[in-house]
A protein has these predicted regions:
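Aromatic-rich carbohydrate-recognition surfaces in CAZymes
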Residues: 1-89, 109-112, 116, 240-258, ...
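Carbohydrate-binding/catalytic loop surfaces
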Residues: 12-31, 35, 73-104, 156-180, ...
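Aromatic (Trp/Tyr) and acidic
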Residues: 94-105, 170-207, 232-268
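A generic structural motif
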Residues: 107, 122, 129, 256-257
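Intrinsically disordered, low-complexity regulatory segments enriched
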Residues: 36-39, 96, 120, 143, ...
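Catalytic cores of carbohydrate-active enzymes
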Residues: 13-14, 65, 69-76, 116-225
Length: 268
């Protein structure tokens, strides 16, 4: 609730507060829907969730659809495009000497997976609350987003999702961000696609401590997080293992394989 009070034009502050707050993270509003979703599951009272957070969640969807923030918008294909010069807008946000190390400008895979999940979840809540105005306004969006997501991110030959897509096309760096398209409650991809994605992630990114942020096969890979600030920032999301990612990896596998994956999940 503290963060909700700081919501502005569909964004939460990344760092700072008040006049010094930096609203430069496109991830946070998308994860807000996930957080409310998890709270809803635990509480078991969707009516309370809608009453407390429905209007705020609506305002986020509207802000992205209408493009109220420079460089952040929902395109005609239903996907979220994000680009601001000199800024890294996703969680891979290291910047060295004014240049994003992992820029990912354009359509980012996890942002659009989270966007699909958010829209689907909001429609579920709206149906339970009988908010027919919202339903009429958004009911066609899930199919549009799902179709566009697959057409934009899926690459059949290697069998995984592009990390991001811009004017130059798909960026096929093997990164963990695609895991969220497999782990979220509402997923825009098929089970067959999930299986293929998870095989690639398991083969190239899985470690006993978490998931690598980049495949060791990639020439940009940094196997050690060390050195001065610039050197560490250059490795921060270019190979460094992040433990928090293992949660989505386990969740994705449990959704796909059920109890069959439990022994492996316990080992992780």
């Amino acid at each position: 609730d503290t963060m909700v009070r700081q919501l502005h034009d569909g964004l939460f502050p990344n760092i700072g507060k008040g006049d010094k707050a930096a609203y430069n993270s496109i991830d946070a509003p998308m994860w807000f829907f996930w957080a409310v979703q998890e709270y809803d599951k635990a509480l078991g009272e969707p009516g309370t969730v809608w009453k407390n957070y429905g209007s705020k969640m609506k305002s986020i969807l509207t802000a992205f659809r209408e493009g109220v923030n420079p460089g952040l918008r929902m395109d005609a294909n239903g996907l979220i495009w994000a680009r601001q010069p000199g800024k890294a807008l996703t969680w891979m946000d290291a910047v060295v000497r004014g240049v994003p190390v992992t820029p990912r400008a354009g359509y980012a895979v996890e942002i659009n997976a989270l966007w699909y999940n958010a829209v689907c979840y909001m429609l579920k809540l709206a149906e339970e609350a009988k908010d027919n105005t919202f339903i009429k306004e958004w009911k066609d969006m899930p199919e549009l987003i799902r179709t566009s997501f697959v057409e934009t991110f899926w690459n059949e030959e290697p069998g995984y999702l592009a990390d991001y897509v811009d004017e130059k096309g798909q960026n096929l760096d093997v990164r963990p961000n695609q895991v969220f398209a497999c782990s979220l409650t509402y997923s825009p991809i098929t089970d067959d696609m999930k299986e293929r994605v998870l095989k690639v992630v398991t083969r190239e990114l899985l470690t006993p401590k978490g998931l690598r942020t980049l495949s060791p096969k990639n020439p940009k890979y940094h196997g050690h997080y060390e050195g001065n600030q610039d050197e560490r920032d250059n490795a921060y999301h270019q190979g460094t293992v992040w433990p928090w990612l293992i949660g989505a990896y386990i969740e994705a596998n449990l959704k796909l394989y059920g109890k069959q994956f439990l022994p492996e999940a316990k080992e992780l």
